[in-house]
A protein has these predicted regions:
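Nucleotide-sugar donor phosphate/pyrophosphate-binding loop at the beta->alpha transition
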Residues: 61-65, 100-102, 110-133, 146, ...
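Conserved acidic donor-binding segment of nucleotide-sugar-dependent glycosyltransferases
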Residues: 306-307, 311-318, 327-332, 687-694, ...
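N-terminal strand-loop element at the rim of the active site
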Residues: 5-61, 144-149, 159, 232, ...
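Aromatic "clamp/platform" in nucleotide-sugar-dependent glycosyltransferases that forms part
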Residues: 255, 274
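Short His-centered aromatic/hydrophobic patch
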Residues: 81-87, 105
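Active-site anion-handling motifs in enzyme catalytic cores
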Residues: 369-740
């Protein structure tokens, strides 16, 4: 494999480090050539590292002519560009040379020229044009991939990579006090040194660092701060430090080329950026075993796990930063423990070897796709379900399925039909079409291998016959267009209108290869309908495999709704349904009972943010005690994390029960649909009350029993874990149908 890399040659900071590390690793595995458009520190260092480097200076027409000759004579397979100038030149070369163009996006293009409107107008515009011409984009971190998707780039043509560092390098500073004093810092043996290496630009938000440091220093006067970097904000930041009265404890060290020596002189590494991809400042600090405090931006949470490998704070929140710095300053053992944990995680997952391997895998995937385009072979999956309709349960199923497919093949192109395709693209990192874009659907089916009817109760007609006909139509069209067809961890029924039974039987028997079901009741319904030809297996709901969100994220969400993180709560999840109005009073009395007798604060959670509000309001209006409402948009992991904080959960919504069951929380199910009864039976849960039989007394009794059962949480979680293990059969069948 031969790859030509194009870059201006004037780059500094993380982009320079990334390319030097990456090409040093790649040059040991494949033929790479680095082309710079100016000679300077960048090209000199690349040559010193042994990277084959060519400097082409001159006009754009002259450079293009030379590059076309190089590419033709050297038989390159790929053009890989970096930065505005490299991207622009690559966009002019890809057509004439007939090569795919891969572009790495190292930072947010809209922030690259912050406070430089002239440069933004010229270089930013050229870069925007070039990025749209690229065949494939590589975002430095998953967050950059998400950002590019939100800007309208195709999710299936974007890959992610993380900056890796060379862990064979050991940062050393034998006389750190002398070094720090030489920088101009007043310090002694008792000083705790906080540092940052960053440009003094607005996006790095050094002002928040200084404000947070000033707050921490009031509690821990031994703190000192070293700011290593240069930029337009230097005088503004000096004035800020003076205004806060910490100018004698803050050292502006200017730009430092001896980053490893600097890191070895610190006790705490920091990052305060408003936006990042995956900054080297974090991994370089990890290599030096430094305790780290970072803003929660970009891919940083992949490495810095709150309370384990470091501390995170909301970008721009000086008070939160100050609290973390003060805590680390007061506890040397905590600094050592976090520094070691960060080092071990970074060494395992974010080494230069891991980055090199990832880039090689991306190249292999790009070349494979180019070959498939030429041969007309199929690749990819299309998923259909009740997605983008505001229901946390259905969206959780999609999240789980996408995660399982990524484990099968991390580069698998995935397209999802959704009611809100933009939201689906951005949230799950997949391509998405509107569910009624039939022309687009047929176009996608002509190139995919596998159609997945993705979980949930799609084959039912109790809510609508038309929705049933829609899903059956998509199944038949998928098979007609040459796809394998799988119904993935789904529920079946109720089939209330028997006029549809024959159609269900015919279409499923003729078109479906595999059906996996979330409980045995669904298998019985299929058998009753006469479905016999597909391979069928009882597994479980894909959503059971989803993790809960990190503890600090859950705590912040509780506090947003005025709930103490250590409070005692009972959750209610209700929905509108036939006969609900007559039962709303029973829910209200049970919630009041939980508050007044059991000491549990009622919390209502909207699982379907579009539909559950009116039913929730109806119950709350009938209550005598106060109750909180958790509403708004949130991902599945956060919903699971919130439910994990409850002492008991009372839910009509199936996925409210599934999420809570996965965390071992005691349940009370109010069944309006056989799927609720079937799930509770599958986990051996007896507290299931049919909606039509619900009374205040039997609901209060169930709530009391659930509250009393809280201490036996581990037993219930083992049952849910067993179901999660059974769920793996879903992805095993998908792997088989994909031929992997």
């Amino acid at each position: 494999m031969k790859v030509i890399h194009l870059i201006s040659g004037g780059d500094t900071g993380g982009a320079k480090t990334h390319i030097h590390y990456l090409l040093s690793g790649l040059s040991k595995e494949i033929d790479v050539t680095l082309v710079c458009f100016m000679r300077g520190e960048f090209s000199d260092e690349a040559e010193a590292l042994g990277i084959p480097t060519v400097v082409l200076e001159g006009s754009i027409p002259s450079v293009l002519k030379q590059l076309k000759t190089m590419i033709r004579e050297e038989h390159y397979d790929l053009i890989h560009s970096h930065g505005a100038r490299g991207n622009f030149i690559a966009s002019l070369l890809k057509g004439p040379c007939g090569l795919p163009m891969v572009t790495t996006v190292h930072s947010d293009p809209k922030l690259d020229y912050l406070a430089r409107p002239g440069a933004a107008l010229v270089y930013g515009t050229l870069n925007d044009h070039a990025l749209k011409k690229a065949d494939y984009l590589v975002g430095v971190s998953d967050s950059m991939k998400s950002l590019l998707i939100s800007r309208g780039f195709s999710a299936n043509e974007i890959f992610s990579i993380y900056n890796g560092v060379d862990f064979s390098v050991v940062p050393e500073n034998p006389d750190r006090l002398a070094y720090l004093r030489a920088l101009g810092l007043e310090c002694d043996e008792q000083s705790v040194i906080v540092g940052i290496a960053a440009r003094l630009d607005p996006v790095k938000d050094i002002g928040t660092l200084i404000r947070g440091f000033a707050l921490a220093e009031k509690k821990q006067p031994q703190l000192r701060l070293v700011i290593a970097g240069d930029g337009a904000q230097m005088e503004e930041l000096r004035a800020l430090a003076q205004g806060l009265g910490v100018e004698k404890k803050v050292c502006f060290a200017g730009w430092r080329s001896d980053v490893n020596t600097l890191m070895a002189a610190l006790d705490v590494n920091t990052l305060t950026s408003l936006s990042e991809t995956f900054p080297y400042a974090i991994t370089e600090g990890a290599r030096a075993h430094l305790a780290t405090v970072s803003s929660r931006v970009g891919g940083v949470p992949k490495l810095v796990i709150e309370g384990e490998t470091g501390f995170l704070f909301p970008a721009g929140d000086a008070a939160a930063l100050g609290e973390k710095l003060a805590r680390l300053a007061a506890d040397p053992a905590l600094r050592r423990r976090m520094g070691e944990a960060l080092y071990e995680k970074a060494r395992r997952e974010f080494s230069v070897e891991a980055t090199t391997r990832r880039q090689l895998d991306i190249y292999d995937e790009v070349l494979r796709r180019e070959r498939l385009k030429k041969s007309g072979a199929r690749r990819g999956v299309v998923i259909i379900g009740a997605y983008g309709m505001g229901n946390s349960g259905d969206d959780a199923i999609l999240e789980a399925i996408v995660g399982e497919l990524r484990q099968i093949d991390p580069f698998l192109p995935i397209t999802v039909l959704s009611r809100r395709p933009k939201e689906t693209r951005e949230r799950y990192g997949v391509e998405s079409l509107h569910m009624f874009d039939f022309a687009g659907f047929h176009r996608v089916l002509k190139g995919t291998q596998l159609y997945l009817s993705g979980g949930g109760s799609l084959i039912q007609n109790v809510t609508s016959r038309r929705s049933l006909w829609y899903y059956l139509y998509t199944i038949s069209q998928a098979k007609k267009c040459g796809n394998r067809v799988m119904m993935y961890g789904c529920g079946i029924g109720p089939i209330a209108d028997e006029r549809d039974t024959q159609r269900i039987c015919r279409i499923l028997n003729e078109n479906v290869d595999v059906i996996t079901l979330r409980e045995s009741a669904s298998l019985q319904e299929l058998q009753r309908c006469g479905v016999t030809k597909p391979a069928m297996a009882v597994t479980s709901d894909p959503a059971l495999t989803l993790p809960e969100a990190p503890a600090d994220i859950v705590t912040a969400e509780l506090e947003k709704f005025g709930l103490a993180p250590d409070g005692s709560y009972i959750c209610f999840s209700v929905r509108g349904w036939t006969g609900f109005d007559e039962k709303a009073k029973a829910f209200a009395e049970a919630a009041d009972y939980a508050a007044e007798t059991l000491g549990l604060t009622p919390v209502f959670m909207l699982i379907n943010r579009d539909e559950d509000g009116p039913a929730t309001d109806e119950v709350r209006a009938l209550m005598e005690t106060n109750a909180a409402v958790i509403d708004g948009e949130r991902n599945s992991s956060l919903t699971i994390g919130l439910l994990a904080r409850m002492k008991a959960v009372v839910s009509m919504r199936l996925h409210g029960l599934i999420f809570a069951a996965s965390q071992g929380v005691p349940l009370v199910g109010v069944s309006y649909d056989p799927k609720v009864t079937a799930f509770l039976a599958s986990i051996g849960e007896e507290r299931c009350l049919p909606l039509e039989e619900l009374t205040a007394e039997n609901l209060k009794a169930a709530v009391s029993a659930a509250s009393a059962a809280y201490g036996d949480r581990d037993t219930r979680k083992r049952t849910a874990d067993a179901l999660a293990d059974a769920e793996s059969e879903n992805s095993a069948w998908a792997r088989k149908l994909l031929g992997l």
